[in-house]
C-alpha cells in the first residue's frame, strides 16, 4: 500500500525546483486569481526556514514591505507556484533564521556565500 502512495506522490512532485538553502534570497512567482483574471505575482525575500517532507515540503520567505516584515509559507510542489529563482546565496550557520524577526536594519543583513 505504501509503495502506491509513494509512487503517486513522486508523480505529483515538481522536478524543476532549484536547490536553495536558508539565507538565500529567492523570487517566487505565484499565480493569483482576481475575479476572472489570473496573473503572476512575484514575492522576493530571504528564505528563513525549509521543511523537507517529500510532496508536503514547504519553505518560508521573509521580506520587508513598507517597513513591515511580511512572511509567507509556500508549499514547494504546489501548482500555484510558477517558478522559483535564486537571486543571491547567503552564508548562514543555522537551519532556521527566526532570529531575523527581531532584527532590523544592518543587523538583519546576511553575508553572501562565495563559491
Swiss-Prot record:
GO terms for molecular function: structural constituent of ribosome. The gene is rplS. It comes from Enterobacter sp. (strain 638). This protein is located at the 30S-50S ribosomal subunit interface and may play a role in the structure and function of the aminoacyl-tRNA binding site. It comes from the Bacteria. GO terms for biological process: translation. PANTHER family: LARGE RIBOSOMAL SUBUNIT PROTEIN BL19M, RIBOSOMAL PROTEIN L19. InterPro entries: Ribosomal_bL19, Ribosomal_bL19_CS, Ribosomal_bL19_sf, Translation_prot_SH3-like_sf. The keyword NAD does not apply. Pfam families: Ribosomal_L19 (PF01245). Belongs to the bacterial ribosomal protein bL19 family. This is Large ribosomal subunit protein bL19.
Amino acid at each position: 500500500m505504501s509503495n502506491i502512495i509513494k509512487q503517486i506522490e513522486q508523480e505529483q512532485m515538481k522536478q524543476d525546483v532549484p536547490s536553495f538553502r536558508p539565507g538565500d534570497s529567492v523570487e517566487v512567482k505565484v499565480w493569483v486569481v482576481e475575479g476572472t483574471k489570473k496573473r503572476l505575482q512575484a514575492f522576493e525575500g530571504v528564505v528563513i526556514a525549509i521543511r523537507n517532507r517529500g510532496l508536503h515540503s514547504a519553505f518560508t520567505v521573509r521580506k520587508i514591505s513598507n517597513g513591515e516584515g511580511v512572511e509567507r509559507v509556500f508549499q514547494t510542489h504546489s501548482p500555484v507556484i510558477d517558478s522559483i529563482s535564486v537571486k543571491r546565496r547567503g552564508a548562514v550557520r543555522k537551519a532556521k533564521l527566526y532570529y531575523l524577526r527581531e532584527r532590523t536594519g544592518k543587523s538583519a543583513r546576511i553575508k553572501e556565500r562565495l563559491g
